[in-house]
């Protein structure tokens, strides 16, 4: 069975984020099982409805940006918003184990904003719906838990990191003379080089599929 990491980009998430200052608190009751740890499900971010509304996360996915206490090390947790109006405004709760592992503490200040990108792993029968699709094709977002949206395939790569190219037909793996990305970034104008790449079609050998949410 294929094992795909689906990377989802949201083109309508503003690059200049609407940032909400929040207190991030670890909660041992929040789910953090193997499905979350292995990337099959997003971590849970619990907050009240007013906090959620401030960032306008229309797909219910948000990112918390934090700094490890006493350092300049940045830590991000991207997860699924669960509304709980028993939680105070401008407070976000995440699994305590996850927070301590990431930051070394169970409570700290953070910045909350609408996620620009996230990823979900699938390795069950849903993978069969993607095999054979090509760069530029679209599939239903429900495959990765997104309702009422289509995801457009922008590219991908295999387990050796060789990228898919839209101009190479089929599910092939071969060396191609390239003058630009993906697969080759020339250092000089006009430079060309033969590089190993993947074709434009998803096969079981692909491990990452890059997608973008399509808005009508």
Swiss-Prot record:
The gene is rps6e. The keyword Nuclease does not apply. Belongs to the eukaryotic ribosomal protein eS6 family. HAMAP family: Ribosomal_eS6. GO terms for biological process: translation. This is Small ribosomal subunit protein eS6. GO terms for cellular component: ribonucleoprotein complex; ribosome. Coiled coil: none annotated. One of its GO terms (molecular function) is structural constituent of ribosome. PANTHER family: 40S RIBOSOMAL PROTEIN S6. Keywords: Ribonucleoprotein, Ribosomal protein.
